[in-house]
């Protein structure tokens, strides 16, 4: 029973870490990354459709994304969706390909992005700590129902804390990498 609680806690902490990585990958650095356009929705037959379903996005070079639209009739809709997104991008089309040059980040914008990254990181840490709290509550419930002894409870809580410390450290590493990426480019 305790092993299942620990495994469940570790799995949930891993999911929290992956979610954090996903959120942070959408924050623009100076480098062109196709994931930057993942959140863009394009109006397609009256429905908002993810850009990824309508086009292929690749990094052409360090500062340019190339969006190859599958259906020529959608080029203007895709261009408009990129232009009206809050990413501050200015696309230009050439045939079925839309080129999206990424403007260089200003020092002020880099600092703002680092604040956003730190905020996301704090949310990631809170998620990991919430998983720890849930696991500890389950362990205490087992103690209350007299399914485990106090020694087993303390040992299990220590192991949960060790797992938590590992994931908090991983969150810090992800944040440090993203901050370095933002400041280096």
Curated annotation (Swiss-Prot):
Domain of life: Bacteria
InterPro entries linked to this entry: Ribosome_recyc_fac, Ribosome_recyc_fac_dom, RRF_sf
Location(s) in or outside the cell: Cytoplasm
Keywords, sorted A to Z: Cytoplasm, Protein biosynthesis
Main location: cytoplasm
Molecular function terms from GO: ribosomal large subunit binding
Biological process, per Gene Ontology: cytoplasmic translational termination; translation
Cited Gene3D superfamilies: 3.30.1360.40, Ribosome-recycling factor
Gene Ontology, cellular component aspect: cytoplasm; cytosol
One Pfam family this sequence matches: RRF
Family membership: Belongs to the RRF family.
NCBIfam families, per database record: frr
HAMAP family hit by this protein: RRF (MF_00040)
Job of this protein: Responsible for the release of ribosomes from messenger RNA at the termination of protein biosynthesis. May increase the efficiency of translation by recycling ribosomes from one round of translation to another.
Full protein name: Ribosome-recycling factor
């Amino acid at each position: 029973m305790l092993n299942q609680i620990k495994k469940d806690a570790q799995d949930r902490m891993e999911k929290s870490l992956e979610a954090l990585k996903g959120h942070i990958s959408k924050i623009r650095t100076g480098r062109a990354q196709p994931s930057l356009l993942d959140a863009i929705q394009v109006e397609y037959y009256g429905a908002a459709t993810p850009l990824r379903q309508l086009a292929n996005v690749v990094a052409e070079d360090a500062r340019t994304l190339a969006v190859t639209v599958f259906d020529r009739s959608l080029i203007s809709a895709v261009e408009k969706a990129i232009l009206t997104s809050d990413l501050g991008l200015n696309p230009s089309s050439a045939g079925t390909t839309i080129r999206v040059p990424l403007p260089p980040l200003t020092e002020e914008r880099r600092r703002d992005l680092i604040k956003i990254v730190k905020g996301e990181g704090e949310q990631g840490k809170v998620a990991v700590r919430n998983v720890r709290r849930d696991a500890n509550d389950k362990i205490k419930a087992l103690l209350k129902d007299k399914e485990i002894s106090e020694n087993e409870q303390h040992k299990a809580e220590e192991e949960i804390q060790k797992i938590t410390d590992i994931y908090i450290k991983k969150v810090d590493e992800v944040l440090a990498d993203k901050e370095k990426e933002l400041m280096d480019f």
